[in-house]
Amino acid sequence: MLEKLKSTLEKSPVIKKGEYHYFVSPVTDGIPLTEPNLLMEIVDAIEKKFDLEDIDKIVCIEAMGIHLATALSIKTGIPFVVIRKKKYGLPGEVEIRQVTGYGESNLYVNGVNSGDKILVIDDVVSTGGTLISVINALKKISADIKYVIAVVEKGEGRKKVEKETGTKVNTLVKVDVIDGEVKIINNEV
């Protein structure tokens, strides 16, 4: 299962930014090429593993959650909303301070309301900073977080998110960078 995803990740080049080993893949970066069958494999696995019947909205994070949310939305018919990097100043907009292993920035939530049953999807959980910020903001809005899904898990970020937010983070595959190459540690689906 998830053979295309695993193969794509294992072929990903690795670059080093400071002390952070960053792998470049179609799932996490949209380059070199994101093939439709890769996205379908991912959303098929999500649809099989999770009961999505009561989900009101899919919530993704700009930028690399957008293609995943789009594919999942088309497959399931569930609408999606993007947590953006740009402030729009719309009524009810919630600002999030995001601190990751490679920088700090603000994100903005629009279109998520109290009581919305949501699925949060993102490409990767690595340091956990983005998901911690997003989950805490969604809880502040009083959204009902049904699932948090990161396609790829790298490092200890998933455990950190779960510890700091009390919210389970589901992943499809766990990887590590060993000797400059991406290695599959396990897959959870």
Swiss-Prot record:
GO cellular component terms attached to this protein's record: cytoplasm
NCBIfam families xrefs: HPT_Archaea (NF040646), PRK02304.1-4 (NF002635)
Keywords: Cytoplasm, Glycosyltransferase, Purine salvage, Transferase
Pathway: Purine metabolism; IMP biosynthesis via salvage pathway; IMP from hypoxanthine: step 1/1
GO biological process: IMP salvage; purine ribonucleoside salvage
Family classification: Belongs to the purine/pyrimidine phosphoribosyltransferase family. Archaeal HPRT subfamily.
Oligomer and partners: Homodimer.
GO molecular function, one term: guanine phosphoribosyltransferase activity
PROSITE patterns according to UniProt: PUR_PYR_PR_TRANSFER
Gene3D superfamilies from the UniProt entry: 3.40.50.2020
Subcellular location: Cytoplasm
Pfam families, A to Z: Pribosyltran
Protein name per Swiss-Prot or TrEMBL: Hypoxanthine/guanine phosphoribosyltransferase
UniProt function note: Catalyzes a salvage reaction resulting in the formation of IMP that is energically less costly than de novo synthesis.
Catalytic activity: IMP + diphosphate = hypoxanthine + 5-phospho-alpha-D-ribose 1-diphosphate; GMP + diphosphate = guanine + 5-phospho-alpha-D-ribose 1-diphosphate
The protein's Enzyme Commission number: 2.4.2.8
NADP keyword on record: no
